[in-house]
Amino acid sequence: MIEFDFGVVLAQWPMLAHGLVLTVALTLASAVLGTALGIACAWARLHGGRALRSATSAYVEAVRNTPFIIQLFFIFFGLPSLGIRLSVEVACVLAMVLNLGAYACEIVRAGLQATPKGQLEAAMSLALTPWQTFSRVVLPPALARIWPALVSQIIIVMLGSAVCGQISAEELSQAANLISSRTFRSFESYILVTLVYLALAMALRQCLNWVGPRFIFTSR
Amino acid sequence: MKFKLVSSLVSLVTTAVLTVATPAQADDSLNAVLAKKSIALGVASDFPPYGFMGPDFKLTGVDVATAQLIADKLGVKAEFVPVSTPNRIPYLQTKKIDLIVSALGKNPEREKVIDFTIAYAPFFQAVFGPKALNIKSFDDLAGKSIAVTRGTIQDDMLQKVAPPTLKIQRFEDDSTTVAAFISQQTQLLATGAAVAAAAVQKNPQVQAEYKLLLKDSPNFIGVRKGETALLTKVNEILRAAKADGTLEQYSQKWLGRGTGVLPE
């Protein structure tokens, strides 16, 4: 008969709280930087010169066709042999930004390409510069179109940060691992952390759905 | 957790089966070995630096050297039988081997089913680091970073003895822990002697050496219960080898550290 004991696991809450803070911090940093990178890459794939276009698509294909954990290990264990030594947190953010950037690039590009031709012609007839056209006419409605897909991708990256524990980042799943190896209460530890992730993902979705229309793109 | 359960189950079953299946042994192994002019020695073949396959496909290591020494002193041929951690005690009990020389630790459960000689080699959990780093005591660890495998004895020990400013970075398995140290993501490494020796051997560029002891759990040779004549003879050989420095030399050669005080 299995007996549950959540008490000993809950007693370790400072560790869990610490992990939660790091997971949220990693997610916020990589969501902001990764989305910016994604937009830049989407622009580069559509409007950049030939060299820039092929460099961007090489990056996007490399990231989208390799596992996240391998990218993370490459940055943390591989780069030092080239003399680049990053701290655990920086390595995690870099891996998450590069990962989100590649997926966001394709999502944003879909939004940009769906811009009706008439809007571009209208912008041109108003003598807007290419930059004004992109930043004022094309991008905001494109972001509005792809926002739900982008939010899902950000949540996937947040959940993917669980892997960062593998390079000793003390995020949420690492905290759960530590608690389970200290209390020998693995079931309770993982149930608890599952609920925390679930709550976190739902809160993040609500939050981004609220922030998007108000600050990122202004819906009509 | 799972492993713990399985291993305790295995030892429980082994104990139960063996106490039932093997009544008092006849004390005749030493004579049998001398008559046959060969002794069957259970050694590990995949556990450097204790028992492992050398580049020339011959078994080598501290255990293999010690086992060879015993055979030589008995004046018989050494017949090496590769054993694994779960099967070595059953092999001894069923007379497939005469001695276990495979990084065997002594504990009360095992003492119920087999006899132990005196200790012949150290086995230890320790802190390792580059030669350039001066670490003489646990206080010297302050402000440094160290890689350790999560939930191991080393992890627990570090938490107890290390200064709070030591940055303990925990990884999921030995190979990731070692990778973090080898790629110099951490300054130090806390692990078992076997893992560290293999890591240092394969990555000579890091210039790693033994720094501080975390926990000692020396190795003993296992003998079938009741084989007092063989046990006494092996103990004689081991004491002589201890006195003339042979065991010390083996330890220095493979573990990079002296035997220290080995328990009788």
How should each PLM-predicted stretch be described?
Chain B
Residues 65-73, 139, 144-145, 150-153, ...:
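Extended ligand-binding regions for polar small-molecule ligands
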Residues 68, 72, 77-140, 207, ...:
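Acidic, polar ligand-binding/catalytic clefts
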